[in-house]
């Protein structure tokens, strides 16, 4: 990664955890000694956000895994950015492939969520990525551009872009044990950075962090972290294990 962009590692617990399990994970994170040049985020299930935020060191961000596109109302089962902020959290993950595929979230809905979250003062990890069939059909760039265009159409200022981290997560590599090679990851990340140079305000391409998600482990993280345009990771299953600490230290 570029030395001008702070390394970023997010741990997405997904629909996992219990109060007892969380306590163990939080203890291990609290005992670890992280370098100040890495930004760390934990995305916990909604019901645990308050407790996780109160238990973790303030240097570690706590994020929600989703939110809705309006401030309040008759939307059973949804939560708003203001609710996330009300329990002391300042980040949200939006557009994760599981939200897109399982819950049929469209590019436009994801973009509207990003727009509202930013307007309400949250920072956003915005996820994009292609399926295996799309990659095999040579549509990786087309899919990523389609997803990014929807988001970019809702973000007008460089100040808002400063609160966005883009997570490239090839869907075929999530939870499968398959992982994009360092070369494959760098190729897509470099393409995305060039896209930002052409399609967003001047300077966004160099300051925005593009992180990789997809079966990241302690075994493969160091080589991935050495790629110029890979600015960190969005970690799923491994964030529930002790090796998450090693992944957070990939740049040390």
Swiss-Prot record:
One of its GO terms (molecular function) is triose-phosphate isomerase activity. Keywords: Gluconeogenesis, Glycolysis, Isomerase. Pathway: Carbohydrate biosynthesis; gluconeogenesis; Carbohydrate degradation; glycolysis; D-glyceraldehyde 3-phosphate from glycerone phosphate: step 1/1. Substrate binds at residues 12, 14. GO terms for cellular component: cytosol. Its EC number is 5.3.1.1. The active site is at 96 (electrophile), 169 (proton acceptor). Transmembrane segments: none annotated. It catalyses: D-glyceraldehyde 3-phosphate = dihydroxyacetone phosphate. GO terms for biological process: gluconeogenesis; glyceraldehyde-3-phosphate biosynthetic process; glycerol catabolic process; glycolytic process. It comes from the Eukaryota. The keyword Oxidoreductase does not apply. HAMAP family: TIM_B. Homodimer. Belongs to the triosephosphate isomerase family. NCBIfam families: tim (TIGR00419). This is Triosephosphate isomerase.
